[in-house]
């Protein structure tokens, strides 16, 4: 007999009913006679139930029914997969008549039709009319074994337990894999020698006679499943929209990283090129680490580190370093791949850790030697004579800028933001340059005086004057004086070039052209006043002026343009006249120059003749 219990209206979000929320998809839950327990009904329900006497009568014939069912199960286990209709009819005859009457389809349909409303009967008609899904075989059929009692195929809320399990699997890395590994360890797979054999029960058809053996399928499933495989449970999980995936198995990152570093170090030390080996044959063997001496996390690691530190502290560099070799002869050591970027890779931290005092002194000596070579180089001497020693001047200027607080900012930016500050800085710089120039001029005078005194002392050695003319000494003085003057002029020009450029830029930016003055005067005549800051006429200003005033402005501008054209023609005529006069003057100068050259040559010839006559 089937019992139908109405649920009524229940809020699935209420805390007390959340665990039963998945059972709210149908208005009725069917319980078969095999699923319904007597403890579910009260005494009053049993008395009101019209089928209570038939149940009592049914219990008397239950023993014969169980015996017949056990015989069917034994046949299935022995491999007798075929059951004839005669045997099924005979077995049904062994069942009492009361039980057969209670299981008749007509009586069940008539009782359900009396107890169900029309709407509910029409909705649940598919379950009653479908022979593949009878009302009492929901727990017997192997297709629906995994479902809980009262759970419908359509899941509203979802499998709460499955979702929680998935969240735990996402949080705990490697949960499933570790669980499966433990299960495989527990099973004695080494003892399996034969292949897996099937007993053929999966090929049985679900007939009316084999459905009776549905209760024992749970017991037989453990026997029929292959050894070492897990039982697959059929579920109706809610499709998850979570894009996260289960992470892979975890492994020990510490040991992996330690192995990686050890392997990398070994590769670096083993992949040294042969050239470097030939260049440095006297390397200490203690600098190269040994793989056998490395112990990760051991007590001997600290001792090894102390020994290495002591060896490094007591080490002395016997050979020259790459840096000093490159400084000594860059052409020779430029082919060495280790010395290509030596100067860029020179680091103070490396010096503090890897160099001794002796090596630093050697480096200092090498730098001094290189500086001496640079000083005695002819090209460097020519550059210093032509331009002068810029380094001292630049250093002094940088110091002065640092003291004034300019701090590597351009004077143009200072002049744009704060003109007073820029003027003060420029004034200080000009004063500094003037003092520098005065010092250099005094030094040149002292040098000239010393040279004159030396010449005089050389001419009056031992009180005997030497008969030498004064012409060579005057020539030397003239040369050194001109050289000093040229150097001073070059330095002044270099020092003032920035100031002059800034002044020109200011004049271009803030300078007032005559056209601007003319436009302002014309606008003032009309009655429009412009500030000194406004240098351009905007379109908005012109649109506000009336048409006759604009016409007057246009006429004034045309008159001014005509006057400018007249003055331009007059200035061009004057330029032509001046060019012609200049050509005449240059022609006259050329004649005079030729005359003087002729006179000089003739005078020299006369002097030569006179000298030869005196000598003769």
Curated annotation (Swiss-Prot):
One of its GO terms (biological process) is negative regulation of growth. It is found in: Cell junction, Adherens junction; Apical cell membrane. Regulator of the Hippo/SWH (Sav/Wts/Hpo) signaling pathway, a signaling pathway that plays a pivotal role in organ size control and tumor suppression by restricting proliferation and promoting apoptosis. The core of this pathway is composed of a kinase cascade wherein Hippo (hpo), in complex with its regulatory protein Salvador (sav), phosphorylates and activates Warts (wts) in complex with its regulatory protein Mats, which in turn phosphorylates and inactivates the Yorkie (yki) oncoprotein. Schip1 promotes kinase activity of Tao and enhances phosphorylation of hpo by Tao. Residues 550-594 form a coiled coil. Residues 62-71, 204-217 have a biased composition (Polar residues). It is a peripheral membrane protein. The keyword Calcium does not apply. Residues 38-50 have a biased composition (Acidic residues). This is Schwannomin-interacting protein 1 homolog. Residues 38-71, 204-251, 292-320 are annotated as: Disordered. Pfam families: SCHIP-1_C.
């Amino acid at each position: 007999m089937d019992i139908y219990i109405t649920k009524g209206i229940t809020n699935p979000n209420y805390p007390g009913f959340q665990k039963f929320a998945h059972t709210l998809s149908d208005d009725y839950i069917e319980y078969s006679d095999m699923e319904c327990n007597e403890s579910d009904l009260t005494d009053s329900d049993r008395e009101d139930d019209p089928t209570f006497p038939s149940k009592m009568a049914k219990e008397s014939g239950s023993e014969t029914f169980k015996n017949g069912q056990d015989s069917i199960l034994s046949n299935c286990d022995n491999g007798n997969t075929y059951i004839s209709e005669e045997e099924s009819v005979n077995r049904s005859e062994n069942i009492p008549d009361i039980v057969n009457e209670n299981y008749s389809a007509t009586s069940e349909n008539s009782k359900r039709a009396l107890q169900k409303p029309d709407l509910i009967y029409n909705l649940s008609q598919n379950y009653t009319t479908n022979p593949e899904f009878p009302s009492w075989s929901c727990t017997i059929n192997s297709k629906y074994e995994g479902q809980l009692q009262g759970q419908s195929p359509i899941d509203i809320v979802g499998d709460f337990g499955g979702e929680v399990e998935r969240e735990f699997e996402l949080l705990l890395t490697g949960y499933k894999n570790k669980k499966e590994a433990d299960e495989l360890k527990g099973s004695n797979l080494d003892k399996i020698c034969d292949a897996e054999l099937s007993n053929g029960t999966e090929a049985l058809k679900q007939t009316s006679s084999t459905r009776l053996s549905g209760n024992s399928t749970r017991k037989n499933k453990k026997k029929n499943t292959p050894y070492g495989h897990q039982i697959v449970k059929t579920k109706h999980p809610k499709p998850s929209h979570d894009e996260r995936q289960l992470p892979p198995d975890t492994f020990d990152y510490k040991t992996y990283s330690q192995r990686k570093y050890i392997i990398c170090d070994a590769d670096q030390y083993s992949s040294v090129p042969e050239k470097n080996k030939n260049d440095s044959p006297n390397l200490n063997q203690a600098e190269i680490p040994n793989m056998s001496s490395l112990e990760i996390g051991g007590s001997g690691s600290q001792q090894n580190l102390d020994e290495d530190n002591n060896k490094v502290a007591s080490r002395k560099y016997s050979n020259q370093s790459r840096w000093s070799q490159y400084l000594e002869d860059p052409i020779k050591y430029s082919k060495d791949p280790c010395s290509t970027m030596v100067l860029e890779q020179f680091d103070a931290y490396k010096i503090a850790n890897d160099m001794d005092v002796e090596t630093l002194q050697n480096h200092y000596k090498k730098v001094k030697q290189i500086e001496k070579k640079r000083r005695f180089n002819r090209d460097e001497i020519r550059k210093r004579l032509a331009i002068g020693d810029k380094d001292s001047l630049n250093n002094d200027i940088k110091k002065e800028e640092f003291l004034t607080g300019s701090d590597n900012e351009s004077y143009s930016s200072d002049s744009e933001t704060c003109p007073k500050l820029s003027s003060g800085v420029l004034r200080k710089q000009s004063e500094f340059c003037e003092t520098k120039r005065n010092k250099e001029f005094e030094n040149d005078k002292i040098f000239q005086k010393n040279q004159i005194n030396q010449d005089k002392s050389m001419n009056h050695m031992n009180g005997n004057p030497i008969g030498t003319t004064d012409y060579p000494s005057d020539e030397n003085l003239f040369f050194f004086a001109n050289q000093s003057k040229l150097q001073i002029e070059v330095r002044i020009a270099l020092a003032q070039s920035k100031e002059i450029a800034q002044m020109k830029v200011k004049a271009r930016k803030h300078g007032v052209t005559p056209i601007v003055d003319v436009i302002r005067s014309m606008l003032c005549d009309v009655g429009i006043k412009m500030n000194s800051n406004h240098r351009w006429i905007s379109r908005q200003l012109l649109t506000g002026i009336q048409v006759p005033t604009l016409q007057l402005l246009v006429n004034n501008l045309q008159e001014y343009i005509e006057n400018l054209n007249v003055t331009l023609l007059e200035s061009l005529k004057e330029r032509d006249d001046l060019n012609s006069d200049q050509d005449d003057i240059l022609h006259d100068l050329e004649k005079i120059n030729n005359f003087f050259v002729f006179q000089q040559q003739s005078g020299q010839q006369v002097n030569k003749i006179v000298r030869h006559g005196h000598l003769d």
